[in-house]
């Protein structure tokens, strides 16, 4: 049974308090048709990343939240509400564990056996932790990545440069706008027409075509004129990329955001229509995967050839290199990952995808907080540019929300300012403050966030576990711990938190601790690995690290 879900707006409560109303509204917001990729099947984004295991579980979660007291905690096991325990008002109202498996059994094949038996759910990162805010949630990170590429190779701008990528799903859909915000041109290959239509509708993609020659003509004209342009091409990357190599057409930058982390549901083989692929996936998944692997090999071999001919290439965290490597492309890892290449220094400062959403549903609440963040950090010209661009270019999906990459000290200062705005009646209703799991200290993912760590600690998973426990101890409203987000089952462990700014003194105390400690652990994680930026940041903010100077 499916239905249309939208979070309530305004100040009338369905639950007993804002600390339980907030997770209920954000769960519902994850399944808003404006937000979710496939809401009828509870799929939010990222292949099969779900908000709840099934509709019965969804209904029970909502019912339980409506009756939950301020000293009780709901436990959610892979999208299923399993228990309520008496705790205390400082404890989280919800604790979530999604997709976690003992390491020896942590592979897609076994996961799918358990999923078919109704025992587990794939939560991705923010799908099962109820803090997905639509494509904007990844937009600034994508913008920052392409800005870093421009700064490193192209004198700080992508003007007159073009990017080749593939995948316009809920994550990859941020790429076209992120490139054009950096004044560049992008050709984005996508096999699913619905995804192209969605990006056009939300303003992330300028134009589309199903003809390669027409697409290239538009791209080349924009390059000559130095005008930003995003072009969607309805086609398969495993066909398009080798064809470009054959023609000697080499982009300036090449990356990829197909959902290759889940090859069965996230990647479509070449040489067949999208509908035929869906039928084959259902009728003969083994044959389907064989064709996927062959296509991925062609796809990555073409990118490697473009790299040899001068293109700046990087993997955008979907684990496609590993998939290609496992099927014969032994130089797949000559393609660098985007985190060590472009994001690690930001993580070392404690910067990452901090986000907030207006529970009122009133966009004015977000515009007022936009103004506040610029007042608090007037020295940050890059932040100012981002907020101004977001206000002009980003369309709301579901509850109005904003993302800004803020660092150690900044997150707590801003969170407390928001809480005061709620207290003083400047905002219509409370604000939820959270982040992506893809953050400075909350992930162990050797092919993405923790790839090529300075001390070789890529696969150490103690840090996200410490992050989750620290957020519980600090007073977050809900805390989650997941497996397999971004890069797929077997390749990552990660934690998330959300805290509600409801204007109370208790919220003030919780926000101060959570927003200091959560990001502080990220600084510690990078300082412990030997990154000078992180060491200096830890000292600047007086973070106690007993062995820092030993």
Swiss-Prot record:
Keywords: Cytoplasm, Histidine metabolism, Lyase, NAD. Its cofactor is NAD(+). Signal peptide: none annotated. NAD(+) binds at residues 46-47, 124, 190, 236-237, 257-261, 267-268, 316, 486. One of its GO terms (cellular component) is cytoplasm. Disulfide bonds: none annotated. PROSITE patterns: UROCANASE. Catalyzes the conversion of urocanate to 4-imidazolone-5-propionate. Its EC number is 4.2.1.49. It comes from Thermosipho melanesiensis (strain DSM 12029 / CIP 104789 / BI429). GO terms for molecular function: urocanate hydratase activity. This is Urocanate hydratase. The active site is at 404. GO terms for biological process: L-histidine catabolic process to glutamate and formamide; L-histidine catabolic process to glutamate and formate. It is found in: Cytoplasm. Binds 1 NAD(+) per subunit.
């Amino acid at each position: 049974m499916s239905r249309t879900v939208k979070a309530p707006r305004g100040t009338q409560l369905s639950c007993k308090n804002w600390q339980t109303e907030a997770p209920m509204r954000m769960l519902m917001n994850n399944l808003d048709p404006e937000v979710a990729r496939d809401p009828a099947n509870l799929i939010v984004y990222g292949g099969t990343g779900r908000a709840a295991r099934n509709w019965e579980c969804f209904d029970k979660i909502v019912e339980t939240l409506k009756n939950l007291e301020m000293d009780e905690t709901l436990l959610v096991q892979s999208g299923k509400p399993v228990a309520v325990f008496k705790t205390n008002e400082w404890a989280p109202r919800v604790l979530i564990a999604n997709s976690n498996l003992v390491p020896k059994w942590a592979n897609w094949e076994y996961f799918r056996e358990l999923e078919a038996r109704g025992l587990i759910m794939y939560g991705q990162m923010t799908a099962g932790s109820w803090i997905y805010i639509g494509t904007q949630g990844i937009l600034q990170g994508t913008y920052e990545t392409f800005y870093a590429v421009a700064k490193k190779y192209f004198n700080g701008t992508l003007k007159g440069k073009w990017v080749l990528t593939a995948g316009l799903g809920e994550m990859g859909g941020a790429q076209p706008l992120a490139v054009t915000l950096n004044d560049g041109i992008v050709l984005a290959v996508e096999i699913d027409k619905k995804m192209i239509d969605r990006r056009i509708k939300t303003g992330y993609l300028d134009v589309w075509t199903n003809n390669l020659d027409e697409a290239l003509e538009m791209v080349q004209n924009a390059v000559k004129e130095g005008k930003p342009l995003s072009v969607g091409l309805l086609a398969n990357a495993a066909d398009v990329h080798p064809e470009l190599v054959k023609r000697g057409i080499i982009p300036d930058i090449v990356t990829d955001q197909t959902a290759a982390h889940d090859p069965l549901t996230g990647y479509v083989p070449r040489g067949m229509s999208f509908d035929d692929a869906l039928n084959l996936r259902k009728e003969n998944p083994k044959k389907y995967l064989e064709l996927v692997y062959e296509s991925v090999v062609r796809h990555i071999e073409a990118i490697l050839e473009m790299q040899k001919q001068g293109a700046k290439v990087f993997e955008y965290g979907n684990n496609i290199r590993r998939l290609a490597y496992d099927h014969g492309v032994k130089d797949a890892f000559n393609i660098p990952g985007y985190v060590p290449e472009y994001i690690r220094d930001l993580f070392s400062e404690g910067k990452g995808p901090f986000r907030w959403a207006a529970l009122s549903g009133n966009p004015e609440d977000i515009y007022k907080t936009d103004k506040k963040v610029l007042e608090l950090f007037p020295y940050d010209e890059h932040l100012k540019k981002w907020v101004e661009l977001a206000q002009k270019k980003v369309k709301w999906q579901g509850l109005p929300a904003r993302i800004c990459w803020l660092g150690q000290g900044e997150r707590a200062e801003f969170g407390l300012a928001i809480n005061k705005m709620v207290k003083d009646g400047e905002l219509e209703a409370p604000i939820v403050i959270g982040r992506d799991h893809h953050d400075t200290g909350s992930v162990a993912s050797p092919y993405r966030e923790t790839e090529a760590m300075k001390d070789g600690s890529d696969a150490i998973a103690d840090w996200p576990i410490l992050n989750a426990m620290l957020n519980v101890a600090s007073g977050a409203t809900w805390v989650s711990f997941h497996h397999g987000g971004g890069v797929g089952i077997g390749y990552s462990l990660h934690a998330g938190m959300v805290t509600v700014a409801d204007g109370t003194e208790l919220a003030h105390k919780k926000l101060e601790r959570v927003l200091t400690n959560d990001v502080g652990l990220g600084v510690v994680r990078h300082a412990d690995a030997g990154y000078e930026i992180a060491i200096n940041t830890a000292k600047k903010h007086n973070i106690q690290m007993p062995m820092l100077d030993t």
